């Protein structure tokens, strides 16, 4: 009997572990992250995540070989290194972390020192992502960041010294007090470090954040729409001239140093997740952990060995075929190479070009999208990437 090949959308291709602690919450942040927790709470949380890993050990059998690992937050680096080691070792013990693989950890430059970075490298993390955001001290202060520009540059250098060959940095444009000149200076200083991966995001004022309140009260002024558009263009042209490839709407790499982990998300392949508010996807449904740290810890404490009441620990969302296709197209079109329509046909039994012919026609005419028949991929053009959110709406099936 012929063995049918396991497709990448039939196994977990990545693992995300959420560490929701921060030294201080940034003004713009609406993620599930919390400041003010003491060392005991962090240790209790570590124990709870380790218990969740043990209770879900059977799921390790569905991990793809060399699936990527990602510790995100929050700020994972605020955890004591022994707690990070305990989490990493639990994943390895139960078969979730199979080396060699890409293993990334997020670090705030204000929490980085050489000893900590060397420990992270020794645990098997081979990629590190720094939340730099800006290299202008006034812009960092305006956003409530805990690090200075100098600390960020020092952290990048220390990561190299600790043995990290793969280093990424996040930047934000459209910040209060930011100008085209200050943004260019940040880009110049960052790329001068030799970094090979940069993620750049336009500032979004999320409802309910301190930033939104300050903007509403007129206490913070953001760059106007035209200036923000000029900043976007500056990012594209500057990084292109410095040899960076834009491989996703917000991500740029040199020498093929793409994020394998994030590529799993953009390919809409399954990934498993552990921790409070951590969101996983098995190819059919989304599973999100309890959002509050204390509730998550207490719920795990109540479980005995072999007892995992998913309804008590997770919110499970069953996705319809239409919703799956919608998200597949949203995510795939974020990538420069686009969404695979051959995979869409195999996974969802739909001919995208035929199903959305009338909606796509004007987009082809305006040269906002393009189709490559040789690869069967539909992609956004450079112009299309500027209005990506409007194009994504085409695939919303009501």
What positions do the PLM features span?
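Auxiliary N-terminal substrate/complex-recognition segments of SAM-dependent methyltransferases
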Residues: 14, 227, 358-360, 389
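Minor-groove-contacting beta-hairpin "wing" of winged helix-turn-helix DNA-binding domains
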Residues: 376-381
């Amino acid at each position: 009997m012929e063995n049918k090949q396991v497709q990448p959308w039939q196994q977990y291709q990545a693992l995300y572990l959420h560490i929701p602690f921060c030294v201080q919450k940034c003004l713009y942040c609406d993620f599930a992250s919390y400041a003010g927790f003491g060392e005991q709470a962090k240790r209790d949380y570590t124990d709870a995540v380790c218990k969740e890993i043990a209770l879900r050990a059977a799921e390790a059998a569905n991990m793809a070989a060399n699936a990527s690992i990602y510790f995100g937050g929050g700020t994972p680096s605020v955890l004591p290194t022994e707690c990070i080691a305990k989490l990493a070792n639990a994943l390895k013990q139960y078969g979730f972390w199979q080396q060699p693989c890409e293993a990334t950890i997020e670090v705030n430059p204000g929490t980085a020192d050489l000893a900590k970075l060397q420990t992270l490298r020794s645990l098997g993390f081979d990629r590190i992502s720094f939340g730099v955001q800006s290299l202008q001290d006034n812009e960092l202060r305006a956003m409530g960041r805990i690090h200075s520009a100098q600390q960020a540059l020092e952290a990048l250098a220390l990561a190299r010294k600790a043995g990290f060959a793969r280093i990424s940095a996040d930047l934000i444009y459209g910040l209060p007090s930011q100008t085209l000149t200050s943004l260019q200076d940040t880009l110049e200083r960052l790329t001068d470090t030799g970094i090979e991966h940069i993620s750049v995001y336009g500032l979004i004022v999320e409802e309910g954040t301190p930033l939104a309140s300050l903007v509403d009260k007129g206490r913070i002024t953001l760059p106007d729409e035209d200036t923000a558009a000029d900043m976007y263009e500056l990012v594209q042209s500057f990084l292109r001239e410095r040899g960076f490839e834009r491989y996703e709407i917000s991500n740029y790499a040199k020498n093929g140093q793409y994020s394998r982990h994030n590529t799993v998300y953009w390919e809409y392949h399954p990934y498993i997740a552990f921790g409070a508010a951590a969101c996983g996807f098995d190819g059919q449904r989304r599973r999100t952990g309890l959002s509050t740290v204390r509730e998550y810890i207490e719920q795990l404490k109540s479980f005995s060995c072999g007892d995992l009441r998913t309804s008590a620990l997770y919110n499970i969302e069953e996705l319809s075929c239409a919703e799956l296709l919608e998200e597949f197209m949203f995510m795939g079109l974020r990538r420069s190479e686009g969404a695979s329509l051959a995979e869409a046909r195999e996974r969802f039994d739909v001919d995208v070009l035929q199903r959305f012919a009338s909606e796509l026609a004007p987009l082809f005419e305006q040269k906002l999208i393009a189709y490559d028949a040789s690869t069967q991929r539909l992609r956004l053009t450079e112009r299309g990437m500027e209005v990506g959110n409007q194009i994504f709406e085409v695939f919303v099936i009501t």
